[in-house]
Amino acid sequence: MNFSGKYQLQSQENFEPFMKAIGLPEDLIQKGKDIKGVSEIVHEGKKIKLTITYGPKVVRNEFTLGEECELETMTGEKVKAVVKLEGDNKMVTTFKGIKSVTELNGDTITNTMTLGDIVYKRVSKRI
């Protein structure tokens, strides 16, 4: 399945507790909690380009599925990780104790990030 497309955030669960747990400052948490971010994915073969726009903040990551890469996190930190494809509709990676699963079903992308007992879930629809 090809992940290419532009997706806008529709809903999210546990945004504030998760952002606090990863060390995002309170003022940025308050500014960011109501922003309907847009993710753009270009998926060509095993190569993925991901651009996430949250208001004025833009995070860009490029990686090859199954190979170690450097990813920029929501806090601006750079981390080494391997993004793997599970089945044909899930991308999975782990970094700094966070497991991230991005699943595509039709025109809906669900990203679930788990840190300890905090599960942050974002649901975005293709636009």
From Swiss-Prot:
The modification Phosphothreonine is found at T51. GO terms for biological process: cellular response to hydrogen peroxide; cellular response to hypoxia. It comes from the Eukaryota. Its main location: cytoplasm. The modification Phosphoserine is found at S11, S39, S100. It is found in: Cytoplasm. One of its GO terms (molecular function) is chromatin binding. One of its GO terms (cellular component) is cytosol. Signal peptide: none annotated. CDD domains: FABP1. The modification N-acetylmethionine is found at M1. Forms a beta-barrel structure that accommodates hydrophobic ligands in its interior. Belongs to the calycin superfamily. Fatty-acid binding protein (FABP) family. This is Fatty acid-binding protein, liver. It comes from Mus musculus (Mouse). The lineage of its organism: Eukaryota, Metazoa, Chordata, Craniata, Vertebrata.
